[in-house]
């Protein structure tokens, strides 16, 4: 996710480029977006010890440990909801966390030695992302892994960072938003829960806005479309 933007940011830094306007083209129905949540995506891999299903005590079931991992994430999700920032401008107003997929095992009567969990969180504030990672890493290193290694020392749990997109914060005065307003005649401002590269450009001082034709409701679908008049 956002592989090209960080490279561009580094090049801009090298050239001393600190001012200007960035328009991030995304399907917003030409609405002016001046803030969005972050988007952190991960895949966690579990490796245990296979064996016959009749002797589960002799193996390390990766699927079962992955299930406990997911249960912990769901408990953390409840905490995130309870930590909803006051006056949050987002919908939903809190940091979201969801499990996108789980796969592992080869048969009912075989102890699963491998499993993977795909998961993501969309933090309202950067601190929530730090909190989630600290909590789940602590659970893995202090509870799950020690148990797995008691039976099979080569057991492992590995987290792969697919992408960590920082949030895009609302600013009282935005040159980029004013430019789009002058072009479209729309003075309203909206927020979205999906992620873009906007926060990366904002972070180095470039006035940034997210705006473009089409609707996000059609994204990631086969029937992706936009109106001709847009």
What are these regions (language model features)?
Residues 43-222, 227:
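Metal-dependent amide/peptide-bond hydrolase catalytic core
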Residues 1-41:
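Acidic/histidine-rich catalytic neighborhood of metal-dependent amide-processing enzymes
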């Amino acid at each position: 996710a956002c592989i090209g933007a960080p490279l561009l940011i580094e090049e801009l830094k090298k050239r001393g480029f600190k001012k200007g306007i960035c328009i991030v083209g995304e399907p917003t129905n030409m609405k002016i977006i001046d803030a969005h949540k972050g988007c952190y995506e991960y895949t966690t891999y579990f490796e245990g010890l296979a064996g016959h299903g009749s002797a589960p005590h002799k193996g390390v079931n990766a699927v079962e440990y992955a299930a406990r991992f997911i249960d912990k994430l769901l408990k953390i999700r409840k905490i995130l909801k309870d930590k909803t920032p006051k006056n949050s401008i987002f919908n939903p107003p809190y940091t979201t966390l969801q499990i996108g997929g789980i796969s592992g095992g080869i048969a009912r009567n075989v102890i699963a030695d491998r499993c993977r969990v795909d998961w993501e969180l969309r933090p309202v504030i950067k601190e929530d992302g730090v909190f989630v990672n600290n909590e789940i890493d602590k659970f893995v290193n202090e509870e799950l892994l020690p148990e797995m290694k008691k039976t099979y020392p080569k057991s492992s749990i590995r987290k792969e960072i697919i992408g960590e997109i920082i949030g895009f914060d609302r600013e009282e005065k935005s040159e980029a938003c004013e430019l789009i307003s002058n072009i479209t005649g729309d003075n309203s401002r909206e927020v979205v829960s999906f992620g873009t590269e906007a926060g990366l450009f904002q972070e180095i001082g470039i006035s940034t806005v997210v705006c473009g034709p089409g609707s996000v409701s059609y994204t990631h679908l086969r029937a992706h479309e936009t109106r001709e008049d847009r």
